[in-house]
Swiss-Prot record:
InterPro entries: Aldolase_TIM (IPR013785), HMG_CoA_lyase_AS (IPR000138), HMGL (IPR043594), PYR_CT (IPR000891). This is Hydroxymethylglutaryl-CoA lyase, mitochondrial. Keywords: Acetylation, Disulfide bond, Lipid metabolism, Lyase, Metal-binding, Mitochondrion, Peroxisome, Transit peptide. A motif (Microbody targeting signal) lies at residues 323-325. Belongs to the HMG-CoA lyase family. The gene is Hmgcl. It is an enzyme of class 4 (lyase). The active site is at residue 266. Residues 33-300 form the Pyruvate carboxyltransferase domain. It catalyses: (3S)-3-hydroxy-3-methylglutaryl-CoA = acetoacetate + acetyl-CoA. Mitochondrial 3-hydroxy-3-methylglutaryl-CoA lyase that catalyzes a cation-dependent cleavage of (S)-3-hydroxy-3-methylglutaryl-CoA into acetyl-CoA and acetoacetate, a key step in ketogenesis. Terminal step in leucine catabolism. Ketone bodies (beta-hydroxybutyrate, acetoacetate and acetone) are essential as an alternative source of energy to glucose, as lipid precursors and as regulators of metabolism. Homodimer; disulfide-linked. Can also form homotetramers. Pathway: Metabolic intermediate metabolism; (S)-3-hydroxy-3-methylglutaryl-CoA degradation; acetoacetate from (S)-3-hydroxy-3-methylglutaryl-CoA: step 1/1. It is found in: Mitochondrion matrix; Peroxisome.
Length: 325
């Protein structure tokens, strides 16, 4: 782990004066998009070297300063399975809680939920999947058993007035089972929604999706779950994350998950590379005239910070381009 240096200011030449293009030929697009920043959890969970707790806390604070409305802070999973998240309570207690910003945490079971609530969590997330093999490797149980675990979490969350977000993994393909049926994705999404999840994030966990697959999957899911309750979570393994996200926006989705500097992967999904970079998403949305409330300059600084801490290059094309200006 490299020592953390002060982030260098970037020259946003051509970005600060960026004008929105005409979108009349692109179909209806949302006027505003809620970005769910998953870098501190999904982005860091697969790092081999343990990231110091103060670095995680500072990253989240910088993302808050950038204006991101939702920042997934950590995961209350067993350190045996994900050692990187062993400091979950310290992270959640240590971050600054900015007014108007939500800091959800992943809670796969009742034990995790109880620990999260004790640490001050106000919103939690649960993970489902459309693949039996993936669920076995990721949660050590069947799909049906995973829903039984969620049921207890959902009941406890409702009793405590804590919001629950649901994830559907492998929505566009599975590393073990290959192609995934849109109908199966719709079935799992409907079940999570009917259990009380206020929002369902549809994840292309290994990044194999294309715009056509995204359209077919969303069409099926939207027959079962209101589009206002849907989000997309795209990995960029094959360079399709922005294209897939744009299709989702054109279909009415207005919530997008992304990760600063494109950090991320999945410890149980071989070949999965990083998430859609938040910097690239914000740049595209700015160009489309879609409001996000995110300060791109401060976001780039947060990306610089964590990449220096990890001693790695950013996966964000926008960060790479502005570094050369």
């Amino acid at each position: 782990m490299a020592s953390v240096r002060k982030a260098f200011p970037r020259r946003l030449v051509g970005l600060t004066s960026l004008r929105a293009v005409s979108t009349s030929s692109m179909g209806t697009l949302p006027k505003q998009v809620k970005i769910v920043e998953v870098g501190p959890r999904d982005g860091l969970q697969n790092e081999k070297s343990i990231v110091p707790t103060p670095v995680k806390i500072r990253l989240i604070d910088m993302l808050s300063e950038a204006g991101l409305p939702v920042i997934e802070a950590t995961s209350f999973v067993s350190p045996k399975w994900v050692p990187q998240m062993a400091d979950h309570s310290d992270v959640l207690k240590g971050i600054q809680k900015f007014p108007g910003i939500n800091y959800p945490v992943l809670t796969p079971n009742m034990k995790g939920f109880e620990e999260a609530v004790a640490a001050g969590a106000k919103e939690v997330s649960v993970f489902g999947a459309v693949s039996e093999l993936f669920t076995r490797k990721n949660a050590n149980c069947s799909i049906e058993e995973s829903f039984q675990r969620f049921a207890g979490v959902m009941q406890a969350a409702q009793a405590a007035s804590i919001s629950v977000r649901g994830y559907v993994s492998c929505a566009l393909g599975c590393p073990y089972e290959g192609k995934v049926s849109p109908a199966k994705v719709a079935e799992v999404a409907k079940k999570l929604y009917s259990m009380g999840c206020y929002e369902i994030s549809l994840g292309d966990t290994i990044g194999v999706g294309t715009p056509g697959l995204m359209k077919d999957m969303l069409t099926a899911v939207m027959h079962e779950v209101p589009v206002t309750a849907l989000a997309v979570h795209c990995h960029d393994t094959y360079g399709q994350a922005l294209a897939n996200t744009l299709v989702a926006l054109q279909m009415g989705v207005s919530v997008v998950d992304s990760s600063v500097a494109g950090l991320g992967g999945c410890p149980y999904a071989k070949g999965a590379s990083g998430n859609l970079a938040t910097e690239d998403l914000v740049y595209m949305l700015n160009g489309l005239g879609i409001h996000t409330g995110v300060n791109l300059q401060k976001l780039l600084e947060a990306g610089d910070f964590i990449c220096q801490a990890l001693n790695r290059k950013t996966s964000s094309k926008v960060a790479q381009a502005t570094c050369k200006l």
